[in-house]
Curated annotation (Swiss-Prot):
Record GO biological process: acetyl-CoA biosynthetic process; acetyl-CoA biosynthetic process from acetate
Organism: Deinococcus radiodurans (strain ATCC 13939 / DSM 20539 / JCM 16871 / CCUG 27074 / LMG 4051 / NBRC 15346 / NCIMB 9279 / VKM B-1422 / R1)
Protein name (record): Acetyl-coenzyme A synthetase
Keyword Ligase: yes
Residues holding ATP: 393-395, 417-422, 506, 521, 532
Amino acid sequence: MTHPNDHIDAMLHETRVIHPSAEFQAGTRVSRAEYERRYRQSLDQPDDFWSEVAHDLHWMKDWDRVLDWQEPHAQWFVGGQTNIAYNALDRNVQRGLGDKRAIIWEGEDGEVRTYTYAELLREVCKAANALEELGVVAGDRVTLYMPLIPEAAIAMLACARIGAVHSIVFGGFSVSALADRINNAQSKLLITADAGYRRGKPVTLKINADEAAKLAPCLEHVLVVKRAGIPLEWWTEGRDLWWHDVVDRQSDQHEATALDSEHPLFILYTSGSTGAPKGVQHTTGGYMVGTYLTTQTVFDLRDDDIYWCTADIGWITGHSYSVYGPLLNGATVVMYEGAPNQPDWGRFWDIVQKHRVTILYTAPTAIRSFMQHGDEIPGRYDLASLRLLGSVGEPINPEAWMWYYRVIGGERCPVVDTWWQTETGSIMLTTLPGAFPSKPGSAGLPMFGVEPALMTRDGEEIGDDDGGLLVIKRPWPSMLRTVYGDDERYRKSYWGEIPHVYFAGDGARRDHDGYYTIVGRVDDVLNVSGHRLGTMEIESALVAHPDVSEAAVVGRPDPVKGESVVAYVLLQDGHTADPAALRAHVSSEIGALARPDAIYIADALPKTRSGKIMRRFLRQLAAGQPVQGDTSTLEDPTVLERLQASPAL
């Protein structure tokens, strides 16, 4: 018996369809026919499909078996041995790419550093030798707490080269969050920097590292990169070591360790519903194959591309699509340390123009911020080098999608929206450019080997043009293997909600063409007068109004309707609020039941430095409750006070 609350009402229907140009289609890596052939093979003959992909890469020992699936645990390329750092560096040098640029790094202060593949290999070998000198061996955990500088990528690859398990903690996290993650992983080494730069000022990291180290007795050493050259308040002799003292004197030769395909590669902590961080554990072989294939196909990668994923490496997007995926493909990667509005809102477009970026992969929250400041700023820059745009991190509103396509892409660049998670390791849903038309706001079609479905809580499948719970019906190579130190949490969170399928925690709908649209986290679905509404749809309707640049919608308890709709809205520069017009617009786009009961006009939303809106704080404010929880990760904690003082309209 299906409970009515198993369905999510799909009420906002986007009808625009954007076709790739004939020129783009002619040169695309994967055509529609090729996608359909390979997708069918990936489901019907998965061993053959994944063997073919994996054999593009170097294996020190071939596997005995492609997949061993003992639900809910998968092992991929069983018995095989490889090394992801070897594949990202040595293999590319051997392919003749030694003189090709691997990383173009730009600091917020304008400093530029470039590493060829041969140079990057030498730096990684030196760092790997340094780690071994400090007693780090395969299987040891190493925590990175760093700004987005080349040494962060070098440290990642050095860990992977010797089989150490890296755990990267975003540089915006607090002392307690850092200490919790060090202790959970039982890391013996912390790699950090004196400081990074953000909005023209040094953001000290060593101070937080020192405080966290006091709470983490497992740490033996703290390796410090001198980024800002600021005076340090504290230095513990014997524990603290300068990167340049230890790394620079090492040999630039190092033999990569042959690692079992299932050897842990990294742990990345993500917030759970309980507030306790979950250490998502990924392994070497499957993650390598998944990120290699998706980078190549989703971004239609070509030899001369200059590829820029704007994510910090503290997040999964930075792991998979700033470092591992592009380098495995021999691409040239742009990295930028700093804020998108330093010194002004033209900084991103200056980087695109200066470095002739061809592929840009960024987040909807950044796109909406650029929208807020109008078309004129990007119009000052030459963006003609761009040929492909990508979106990641959250569902993108159709209006933001269209602005990105029109203003940044000049109506010539396909936009690939991508749905995936820390847990999935690589992109799961997207619209391959050149193969299919795009539908603004829709994540699109499944990637190779991915078999999604929409279900009710009791496992009943839901048809097209209806909303339900997004699940994945079979294992895939880059999937997480466990929650570090808590396998029961892995079983319960991902495979225990609905029997025999991976539970994504997202609501979605699928149209008659098979395109999936994410309507929001299951936790963010509102129950208004018996209707389950995705907050994403209401936000998209608000952003479609010409006065609005960004919106966040939450629910608050209502004695009559169950929940009422509360909207926090940012206006376009120079526009004024007309709450009646906004309510009427939502009513016409979706229906009267989605009309916001309260609208708050905001000058900013509570976001982390990665751009995620912290909706739990908005829910607390909407309900009139005091703000509870760690606010140290917010870009601007004072925004909560301003929102609290804002009157409802």
